[in-house]
């Protein structure tokens, strides 16, 4: 376990030194605090970023999905809310029993409850990346049935609780969950070993956004319904823009 945490720490430094190429659509301009600070919108997107990512939405999958949803005029407006600041996205929290801190899970629950109480007519979609997926796995099961019914869909990228929770979020309909686990991403197999595949999920955000839009389209505008069939999926590995030298470094993690 100690070696794996050291690997994560080293990886954080390398990911800063050799970031993936992100265009303006992916970086976006949302503060990630729209629910707390702004007016109610027809749709609320709640997202938990990956470990070490800055801000409330992070700088990869969160802003990309947020901006895709905001660009869909048919939704009538979207409030994007990141989980934080109690969720610090620290590396060490990955080793906790729930894959993140209790403070992070409780904060996410409070945001879902805030969306439902402040904006009773809003429809909710959610997501998480890496440690952020553990935040969603921890928060959603304990929500009231009324709030769960308001959630149209949840997208999880590089799901660190995929194996532990059986490819689902407990006590939540499987047809409302879309899991992206790239080939070779070992965190999806229940480990803390991070490989290059864990950084490929920006390539899946367009598909994930469209899926959330489809989920919203199937939900009535002011109320929501839940169901129980399964549609959780795995995504193929996509090419990373990092150097071959970095890839070689990753290949030695498990040795």
UniProtKB/Swiss-Prot annotation:
GO biological process: carbohydrate catabolic process
GO cellular component, one term: extracellular region
Superkingdom: Eukaryota
Biotechnology section: May be exploited in the production of biodiesel.
Entry-linked Gene3D superfamilies: alpha/beta hydrolase (3.40.50.1820)
Principal location listed in the UniProt entry: secreted
Enzyme class: hydrolase
Signal peptide: 1-17
Keyword tRNA processing appears in the UniProt entry: no
SUPFAM superfamilies in UniProt: alpha/beta-Hydrolases
Region (Disordered): 219-255
Primary role: Catalyzes the hydrolysis of complex carboxylic polyesters found in the cell wall of plants. Degrades cutin, a macromolecule that forms the structure of the plant cuticle. Also degrades suberin, a specialized macromolecule found in the cell wall of various plant tissues.
UniProt record similarity statement: Belongs to the cutinase family.
Name this protein carries in UniProt: Cutinase 2
Gene name of this polypeptide: cut2
